[in-house]
């Protein structure tokens, strides 16, 4: 193994104007991992690079070289800085060769890897998070029909509207307290005041999404309740949101309100972020047989993609933007 020395990485960063100096930390005698760390940085926040060569398998005699970049980031879940919270994002590259590989073959692996990492293909894949390249790779070789190119995912914000869409349910304002909290009911009841219909600045097809980009991996559907990176929609579980547990945990802004009139019902309402109003959960439940879909968009400050499990949803990670009724398949 070469002597572990200081490594200077120049011409890095988006504009190629940054330099990173890495000082050797040493080699772990147990696993042979060589480690370097950013010079002059606070230990908890320094960048680190590790290089390791795995032990060869008994039969195949394969060696694997792994280069890993560790970028510690101090942040909280809501995106604010907090030096006491450290999260490490890893980027690693692994390539292998056998003990029978010649010097020329190993040198070719090194130079080929460097050229690949500098290619526009990888730069675009990383910068644009572009999922289209599997299609291009398939189309570039082999036989058979060529699949259509896949359009990349959209930004995490809602797409620009191509029209208008009005909420299919009555919408309400719940500001004035009708009854204060009690010992058995630790939340207030509000006066529900019906509002004039409000339009979303998107058309229905925008909310459901063009399948060529919104559903690019075919997992975003009513049945799988799976989000696609930052954007997605899910079948709303209005039954759960109407429970006392949902009122207590307040993962979403749910309020109890009394509808107008002497015989007005007391119901629970869910807040819709896009139109700044509330919608009755009983209305949503009544239409559920026909198919109710709630549109979600990830909040840019949440730092996380849409979860798999509905119970992990909350108003920060997945704010409810819109309620739309669509036929069930």
Swiss-Prot record:
GO cellular component: viral capsid
Superkingdom assignment: Viruses
Mutation effect (residue 292 to M): In strain: Qbeta_1_FR and Qbeta_3_FR
Keywords: Capsid protein, Virion
GO molecular function: structural molecule activity
Effect of substituting residue 207 to R: In strain: Qbeta_2_FR
Keyword Transit peptide set for record: no
Pfam family of the protein (one): Read-through
Cross-referenced InterPro entries: Levivir_coat (IPR002703), Phage_RNA-type_capsid (IPR015954), Read-through_dom (IPR031819)
Subcellular location: Virion
Other information: This protein is translated as a fusion protein by episodic readthrough of the termination codon at the end of the capsid protein. Readthrough of the terminator codon occurs between the codons for Tyr-133 and Trp-134, thereby producing the readthrough extension.
Functional summary from the UniProt entry: Minor capsid protein.
Protein name from the UniProt record: Minor capsid protein A1
Taxonomic source organism: Escherichia virus Qbeta (Bacteriophage Q-beta)
């Amino acid at each position: 193994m070469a002597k572990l020395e200081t490594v200077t990485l120049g011409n890095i960063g988006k504009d190629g104007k940054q330099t990173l100096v890495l000082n050797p930390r040493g080699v772990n005698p147990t696993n042979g991992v060589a480690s370097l760390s950013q010079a002059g940085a606070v230990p908890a926040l320094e960048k680190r690079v590790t290089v390791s060569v795995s032990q060869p398998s008994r039969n195949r005699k394969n060696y694997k070289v792994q280069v890993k970049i560790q970028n510690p980031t101090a942040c909280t879940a809501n995106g604010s800085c907090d030096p006491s919270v450290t999260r490490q994002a890893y980027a690693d590259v692994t390539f292998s060769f056998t003990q029978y590989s010649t010097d020329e073959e190993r040198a070719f692996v090194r130079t080929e890897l460097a050229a690949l990492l500098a290619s526009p293909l990888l730069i675009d894949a990383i910068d644009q998070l572009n999922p289209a390249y599997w299609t291009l790779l398939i189309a570039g070789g082999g036989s058979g029909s060529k699949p259509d190119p896949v359009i990349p995912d959209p930004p995490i914000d809602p797409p620009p509207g191509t029209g208008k869409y009005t909420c299919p349910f009555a919408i309400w304002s719940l500001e004035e307290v009708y009854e204060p909290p009690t010992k058995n009911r630790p939340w207030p009841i509000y006066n529900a005041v019906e509002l004039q219909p409000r339009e979303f600045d998107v058309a229905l097809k925008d909310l459901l999404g063009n399948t060529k980009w919104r559903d690019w991996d075919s997992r975003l559907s009513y049945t799988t309740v799976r989000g696609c990176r930052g954007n997605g929609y899910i079948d709303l579980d209005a039954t759960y949101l109407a429970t006392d547990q949902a009122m207590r945990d307040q993962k979403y802004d749910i309020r109890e309100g009394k509808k107008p009139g002497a015989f007005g019902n007391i119901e629970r309402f869910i807040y819709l972020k896009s139109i700044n109003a509330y919608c009755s959960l009983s209305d949503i439940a009544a239409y559920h047989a026909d198919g109710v879909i709630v549109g979600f968009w990830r909040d840019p400050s949440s730092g996380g993609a849409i979860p798999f499990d509905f119970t992990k949803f909350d108003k920060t990670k997945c704010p409810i933007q819109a309620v739309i009724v669509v036929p069930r398949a």
